[in-house]
């Protein structure tokens, strides 16, 4: 039963295995620390957790933002995992639509297909898997 469920998940979502590992790391961080800390504390703890799970990443990865082919600024991604997935962390009471829209805009700006929006600030870990519009799930 588990194998067929995993197959369905893998067929339905691109990079589901890697996003699942990242979410698992986030769950462990939230289990140990709970909510109530600043975002940077969760960033540091998640870096430790991903190192232990041998997940490669760059942290505070600066990326250029382009408009009509011209660079108009930069933005730092909390984590850029294995060159495939953007991970944006929050430490707020609850995620709102504006945070989801922001994550989707980052995917567009960085020409990336998949991202995770993670919130450590709620009593239970909140996470949203985001995909650039037009990517088939």
Region locations from a protein language model:
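A short, glycine/Asx- and small/polar-enriched loop/turn
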Residues: 54, 71-75
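Well-ordered beta-strand positions
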Residues: 58, 78-80, 119
């Amino acid at each position: 039963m588990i194998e067929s469920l995993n197959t369905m998940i893998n067929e339905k979502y691109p990079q589901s295995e890697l996003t699942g590992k990242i979410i698992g790391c986030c769950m462990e961080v939230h289990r140990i620390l709970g909510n109530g800390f600043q975002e940077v504390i969760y960033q540091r703890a998640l870096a430790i957790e991903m190192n232990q799970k041998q997940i490669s990443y760059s942290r505070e990865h600066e990326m250029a933002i382009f408009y009509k082919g011209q660079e108009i600024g930069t933005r730092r991604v909390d984590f850029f995992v294995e060159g495939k997935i953007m991970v944006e962390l929050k430490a707020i009471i609850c995620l709102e639509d504006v945070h989801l829209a922001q994550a989707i805009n980052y995917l567009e700006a960085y020409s990336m297909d998949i991202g995770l929006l993670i919130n450590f600030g709620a009593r239970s870990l909140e996470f949203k898997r985001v995909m650039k519009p037009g990517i088939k799930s």
